[in-house]
Amino acid sequence: MSDNYIAPNTNIGILYPNWVTYNYKKYKVKKTPFDPNIDLCKLQKKPSGAMKPRPYQEFLQKYMRFESPYRTILVYHGLGVGKTATSIYIYNLLYNKSKNWNVYILVKKSLFKGWLDELNKFLERSDFKDRLSNVHLINYDSSNANIKFKEIIQDKSNIGKNNLYIIDEVHNFIRNVYSNVTNQQSIRALEIYEHLKREIKDTKETRIICISGTPVINRPYELGLLFNLLRPGIFPNKEDEFNNIFLKNEYSKEINQDTKNLFQRRILGLVSYYEDYHKGLYAEKTIKEIEINMSSYQEKVYDYFEAIEEKLDKKKSKYRRKSGTDTEMFKAYTRQACNFVFPYINKDINGEKRPRPNVYRKSLKGVENDIHKHERNLLNKKNNAKASEVLKLYTNACNKYVSSVEKLWKSFQDADKKNKITLQSFIDQLKSDDKLDINEFINKNKNKSKLMNGMYNCSPKILYMCFNIIRNTGNALVYTNYVNMEGIQVIKIYFKFFNITKYGEYHGGIVDREIREKTRSLFNDPKNKNGDFLNVIMISPAMTEGVNLTNVRHVHILEPHWNLVRIQQVIGRSIRQCSHQNLPMNERNVIVYKYFIKRKNEKPTTDQTINEIATNKYNLLDTFLQAVKEAAIDCELFKEVNQSDGEYSCFKFAAEDKLSKELGYAFRKNIYDDLKKENKGSNSSHYETKKIKTFKIKAVTKDSSTVNEYWYNPDTGYVFDIDVDVLIGRINKDKNNLPEMRDIETYIISNLSELDKYKLSKKLV
């Protein structure tokens, strides 16, 4: 390590947070006031050739340059601010120093094209082909990911080069690792993870960049796994040990405040955080939660499935995951019934006999068979039926149900026409008065129309959403967890009768990627900003990452998800930097509707239960993420623009510690040794945060005649840098108890911090 670089785990480690801020202060980003009359998106220049990094990207580029000892980082940057570009910029500078690189990008297969597009955009033009030839895309989600990974890194042409690993959407990779550790059914992600840990420990030139806007999904220990990848051994390898340290108990709703300081000290140097949600660059967002009562018929079918789930739960609880909250099996029946229940058409086709996929029958045999004999008969017409044949039978049964609904509603529509009633007349009535409440409107008019009543009985939620889409202005995004049956497949029937014809689908059920991309391109076409070609696009969970949409005015989230992060990702698809630049400034706003079905009594539905579980989980994880943000290397540099979602204080060590002759380590190698030591820094029992008044002074240091401006607190004598919140030293008092001064207007800083000894040369920053 260069003499001028400081690491947190050295005997001067407590200087590290101040050292970063002091040496890289020229990258500090200040908040600019919002002027509704200035279109910032039109001011964004499009330079020819490779685009230049923004200050927060250039900071990381220089921080991780070839000469730097800092080799691992989590790029925890917000949606739409250029995380991918940041990692490419880092590679650009590394390549400029040495061309001898392998760049392994671990990413989902569906995001390959997006990465290639970004590489073409952000790689420097000089030696472009050579830069690109160093890059290898690896799908970490494939069934043979570990084998493919080994093949690529062991290829003879790649041996002898320095390795740069970029892990995109690292939260998904870590989730796979966690699953491997706990289930022990597969080790493909774990093998890659362990290889990376070994390499970062054994090879000083290897670098790892992890990218995520949402670094943790399900449980706090995922952060333990992530940071153990970036700095092996800083957290326990077992989840129970990690939780015992950082949670008070298994019911904790926040990080253990007694050990928050320990957590933050151990991750110093591992995170860059940047959010910057500038009003002028992003559409304004409004969130509305809509609770809708079940129809009587829906509640009857829902109760039927709830009884089944209770029976399954008692007899087959072993099939639940340990947490019991995020498995797809948990409340699967009632979860679907919250969206839609099939109407009673005859004794074979009705809400209670909805076909179920074969996996449920197999995983819950002995219970399911007693309850759904018609399913067993349907799926096992031949005892020797192959899996593909069973799947075909199941799909045909589902399609029969869906087509039966459409035929039934067509008969209702025909009956309405005979009575001179049309759904369009109700649509026109609702659109003519924007003060009408949709719930009240539906309840008032549903019995006047057989079609509307039929739609209402099956799903008041989807009926409400359709009226809402038509009433709103501009293009819409619809998100549902389901593609078939209670999801997009049924929504399309509602759309048909509502005459919503200009819609597109973008989900994993559409196998041909070109068709999906054609839909997205058409929706995003600037000429489609008012929905002339497509005014609704429907997406599923598979498309919540790596897909950018433009000119969306309203988002409809049909049901909750176990992870609020998933919902945030959906919203993030439609609100990105300058994603609404083709619209007039007064139309750059997005309304997000979250729909929840409820009973007429107070008993919670699965919609409400999932939302409560997700909210509680999110709130716990958010306390850990808050700690991560506070400990970010660039916290002081970007704090001013990062606090749109609430204020926070950057992690610091006490001023007196930084002026001490014996500075000390920020953390010790062994976490249990660290627990025994006296905690220092923010959130420790010995640390107190105070607001102090400062005023600007001119001063010299005791060994220099150069006069500079500083901020000065007369009560403590502390002197701070004029540009950033960094302690420079202290002005002592003379025998008359007055601050020491060289002349009438110039103070003398006699007790200096060690920062100047570790100042980087200009060429390094």
Stretches found by the model and what they are:
Residues M1-P69, G78, A85-I211, P215-V536, ...:
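Helicase-associated low-complexity regulatory tails and linkers flanking the ATPase motor
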Residues V75:
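Hydrophobic anchor at the beta1->P-loop junction of P-loop NTPases
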Residues T72:
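Residues immediately within or flanking Cys/His clusters that coordinate Zn2+
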